[in-house]
Amino acid sequence: MTMIPVIDLEEKIRTIEKPWSPIDITYINDQVIRAAIFHGDYHWHKHDDEDELFLVHRGAIRIQVKGEDTIELAEGQLCVIPKGVEHRPGSDEPSVVLMFEPSALKSTGD
């Protein structure tokens, strides 16, 4: 019989060592759920071949998008950044964000 693991998300989040250093929470098919602390501004980047979903677990973030208005996300809100769209996430206060993305996606941007 296969044991289905229960993941303690808060326990995993406590292992994050510093902002912008995502950790893998779990995998499903070819996708990964990562958690990171956002604080300050990340660099401008894009992902040519993959969409990226941001879900704010705790806090609030902004995602600047080239040529568009800045997206503001509060706790419990999410958005999908389509592949090829240049963006820069950031947060004024430490915020915990879950990212749902293809496991092949480099979490450091391009």
Report each predicted region and the residues it spans.
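Conserved short histidine dyad/triad with adjacent acidic residue
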Residues: 32-48
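Short acidic-glycine-tyrosine-enriched beta hairpin
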Residues: 67-83
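Structural motif
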Residues: 32, 41, 60-62, 86, ...
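A cytosolic small-molecule/anion-sensing beta-strand core signal
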Residues: 29, 57-58, 74-75, 93
